[in-house]
Swiss-Prot record:
This is Glutamyl-Q tRNA(Asp) synthetase. Zn(2+) binds at residues 101, 103, 115, 119. InterPro entries: Glu-Q_tRNA(Asp)_Synthase, Glu/Gln-tRNA-synth, Glu/Gln-tRNA-synth_Ib_cat-dom, GluQ/Sye, Rossmann-like_a/b/a_fold. Keywords: Aminoacyl-tRNA synthetase, ATP-binding, Ligase, Metal-binding, Nucleotide-binding, Zinc. Its cofactor is Zn(2+). It holds the Pfam family tRNA-synt_1c. A motif ('HIGH' region) lies at residues 12-22. A motif ('KMSKS' region) lies at residues 228-232. GO terms for molecular function: ATP binding; glutamate-tRNA ligase activity; zinc ion binding. One of its GO terms (biological process) is tRNA modification.
Length: 295
């Protein structure tokens, strides 16, 4: 069977229920994949059990189904992928690419999130320590389909970053690179808050000899105070009975054409319309859009 030219994915975290910002990201990834006659995969990024909200995983699946989304194959849970992460982390540790870090948050205050390298050559045991990956003094750049060229000098703007936390939980940067490659994802469509994660992921892809996916970062939907809609800011979950109007609103946020008759359609009809008329070039070339400004 021929592999589809486009494989997209939606990868929510179960730290809360889906909200309007989640819907915009899910819709963009779904339409982009389906318009290319591609596959759309679903992955639950349940890497952080202490932050997981009881019932959120089931709620996310139910909401996606109510809003008409259909994914290909079985949903993948990152909590079931720890062996794959451990194998690669251990390989890097054995080859000196990764090292143990015992720095506390207090020690790192004042460095603006850029790791100063205190433990880089300390030779600490990995027990009861975070694991960091060594980064080169190089600039990584990529061409985003909406945001244009984005670049970051890993040494100056990131520093060696954590790939496994001190509590033993694997970091997002490691897991997402491994799983996107394992699932054959070719097109990553997600929120613009993850733009600065991408150069780190490009570096990990390089270390693993992986092909680079295409990237499209959609504008974040923000609150009046500038914070993105999100679970930590008590953004309201998507109501079960508002699929059609909220899908249409999400299409407007993405700059897509609308048919006035769609207001009376089902969620499935709105999605079908969106697939037929999808044009990523119409997505606003912005990092964020205030929710109140979406008509």
């Amino acid at each position: 069977m021929k592999k589809p030219a486009c494989i997209g994915r939606f990868a929510p975290t179960p730290s809360g229920y889906l909200h309007f910002g989640s819907l915009v990201a899910a819709l963009a990834s779904y339409l982009d994949a389906r318009a290319a006659d591609g596959q759309w995969l679903l992955r639950m990024e349940d890497l952080d059990p202490p932050r997981e909200v009881a019932g959120a995983q089931a709620g996310i699946l139910e909401t996606l189904e109510r809003y008409g989304f259909e994914w290909d194959g079985q949903m993948v849970r990152q909590s079931e992928r720890h062996d794959a992460y451990a194998e690669i982390l251990q390989r890097w540790f054995n080859h000196g690419l990764a090292y143990a870090c015992t720095c506390s948050r207090k020690q790192l205050e004042g460095f603006q999130g850029i790791y100063p390298g205190f433990c880089r050559n300390a030779g600490h045991s990995p027990d009861n320590a975070a694991i960091r990956i060594r980064v080169p003094e190089l600039e990584y750049r990529f061409d985003d389909r909406v945001q244009g060229t984005f670049k970051m000098h890993l040494g100056r703007e990131s520093g060696d970053f954590v790939i496994r936390r001190r509590d033993g939980l694997y970091a997002y940067q490691l897991a997402v690179v491994i799983d996107d490659a394992w699932q054959g994802v070719t097109d990553i469509v997600r929120g613009a808050d993850l733009l600065d994660s991408t150069p780190r992921q490009l570096y990990l892809q390089e270390l693993l000899g992986l092909p680079q996916p295409r990237y499209l970062h959609v504008p974040l939907i923000t609150q009046p105070d500038g914070h993105k809609l999100g679970k930590s800011y008590r953004s309201p979950p998507l109501p079960a009975d508002q699929a059609t109007p909220l899908l249409l609103r999400a299409l407007r946020a993405l700059g897509q054409p609308l048919d006035t008759h769609m207001a009376d359609g089902t969620a499935q009809e709105v999605l079908a319309w969106g697939i037929r008329h999808w044009n990523a070039d119409l997505i606003p070339r912005l990092r964020n859009i205030e929710e109140a400004r979406i008509d």
